[in-house]
């Protein structure tokens, strides 16, 4: 069997199992809602396993477990410092995804524990360089929603079932020929986009389109100092550029809060370190970020024929002032092009 065939089979198996897990939630809510739970739980598993791997390295020469080290004041502070430096957050041993899976198996799990654990991850970043990349990251995963069940017991049972299924997926395995975690995310984002119909463009650029755009802006370039997407959606287009050449920093802006969270998760899931990306949550045309910066490459799949204010104040905006006329209120396409050209170095 060729590697390509092996990859294809691994992907098909992964996709089949992922969609089966998604179907556990399908009866309770629409696709856009259960997307947030599935992707959020995958992301929490990723954060947990990342922390576990870092701690395993730190304690490699010590005869002590994660749990034992955390009970010791000196060890605990050292581990916190190491985790904050290397991954930008820390997770207490009892809050790890694997620890909660054991609770589920022993029928001791409570969904409130998961909700608290998620809050603690975000709190751990306060005052750190990583704070902006983590705060509010799970805000769309409402674990108290009655859509998951009318009682805490019902919600606990449903989320516990999903977590058990996710725990069985081999995201990290020496025999895997594909980027399991990245592929899982891209598959689910794409599948949810297909279900969303026209609204899909708000958060997802089809892989074929992303690939063409990424190849165009990286043609003949061994590396990019930075790349910018003013309407970055889930971040898939930015990440595609990184597959074509070495990218040192990713910048993006996204006005939809749910999609903004998805983009930050996607960056971290694809092992982009927290200090190497900056995704901002605001309207690109009306409230632009990064006005003091220039970029080696700018890519985008903007919302075509979108409306904007075309306020007269923008006649003096350096992005538009050289053209003598603003894009019409009914179609902002030209404004997006002018915006992108302005940011090019």
Locate the predicted segments by residue:
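Non-catalytic, mostly N-terminal accessory regions of nucleic-acid modification and defense proteins
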Residues: 1-212, 216-217, 275-284
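Glycine-rich S-adenosyl-L-methionine
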Residues: 319-344
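Short, solvent-exposed loop/helix junctions and linker helices
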Residues: 31, 156, 292, 330-334
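Conserved S-adenosyl-L-methionine
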Residues: 199-300, 305-322, 334
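Short alpha-helical functional segments enriched in proximate histidine and acidic residues
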Residues: 195, 270, 343
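Hydrophobic alpha-helical scaffolding
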Residues: 152, 174, 252-256, 297, ...
């Amino acid at each position: 069997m060729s590697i390509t065939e092996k990859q294809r089979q691994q992907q098909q198996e992964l996709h089949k199992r992922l969609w089966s897990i998604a179907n556990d939630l399908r009866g309770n809510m629409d696709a856009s809602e259960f997307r947030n739970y599935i992707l959020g739980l995958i992301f929490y598993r990723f954060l947990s396993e990342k922390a576990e791997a870092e701690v395993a390295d730190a304690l490699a020469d010590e005869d002590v477990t994660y749990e034992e080290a955390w009970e010791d004041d000196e060890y605990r502070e050292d581990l916190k410092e190491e985790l904050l430096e290397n991954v930008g957050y820390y997770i207490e041993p009892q809050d790890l995804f694997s620890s909660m899976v054991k609770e589920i198996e022993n029928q001791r799990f409570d969904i409130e524990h998961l909700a608290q654990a998620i809050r603690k991850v975000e709190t751990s970043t306060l005052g750190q360089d990583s704070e902006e990349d983590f705060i509010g990251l799970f805000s769309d995963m409402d674990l108290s929603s009655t859509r998951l069940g009318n009682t805490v017991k019902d919600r606990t049972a449903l989320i516990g079932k999903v977590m058990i299924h996710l725990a069985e997926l081999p995201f990290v395995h020496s025999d895997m020929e594909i980027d399991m975690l990245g592929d899982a995310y891209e598959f689910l984002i794409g599948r949810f986009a297909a279900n969303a119909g026209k609204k899909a463009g708000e958060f997802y650029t089809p892989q074929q389109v992303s690939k063409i755009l990424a190849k165009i802006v990286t043609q003949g370039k061994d590396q990019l100092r930075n790349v910018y997407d003013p309407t970055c959606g889930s971040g898939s287009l930015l990440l595609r550029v990184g597959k074509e050449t070495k990218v040192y920093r990713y910048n993006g802006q996204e006005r939809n809060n749910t999609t903004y969270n998805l983009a930050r998760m996607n960056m971290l899931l694809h092992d982009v370190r927290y200090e190497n990306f900056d995704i901002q949550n605001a309207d690109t045309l009306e409230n632009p970020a990064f006005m003091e910066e220039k970029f080696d490459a700018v890519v985008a799949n903007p919302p075509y024929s979108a409306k904007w204010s075309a306020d007269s104040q923008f006649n003096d905006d350096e992005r538009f002032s050289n053209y003598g006329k603003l894009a019409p209120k009914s179609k902002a396409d030209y404004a997006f092009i002018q915006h992108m050209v302005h940011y090019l170095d």
